[in-house]
Amino acid sequence: MYVTHDPSTGTTDSQYDQTDDVDGILSTVTEGFTSWRATDVAERARILLAIADAFDEHADELAKAITTEMGKLPDQAQGEVKLAASIYRWYGEHGPALLEPETLDVPGARLNRVTHEPVGPLVGVMPWNYPYYQVAR
């Protein structure tokens, strides 16, 4: 069982049962990845910019959530929300250029090209102290 609680009051906010359906979850995530990979780069950039805008619009609510759930000081929580929004915005603005294929000048070779393709879902154990930053980066 996963429990979230407010460290300032000791009250339990939410409880989540553990799941035995790891294969089902990974299947769903893989479907999402397949859809995302097929999405045009310009559309992906637009989505990232929309996420940045949503973080800006809901900054107080997002900051309050991590203040309540993990005891992060309000100023630090606001700073993390702003940082995450800036990361989404940066990738929305610069990401398409980063994904452009590169041609390398290699002596004796006809063509050397570097392409950037998504490889698949990532499962990770993340530190708890920067939840929005961990996802944005």
Q: Which residues does each PLM region occupy?
A:
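N-terminal Rossmann NAD(P)-binding subdomain characteristic of aldehyde/semialdehyde dehydrogenases
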Residues: 49-136
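Short, structured beta/alpha segment
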Residues: 1-68, 90, 97
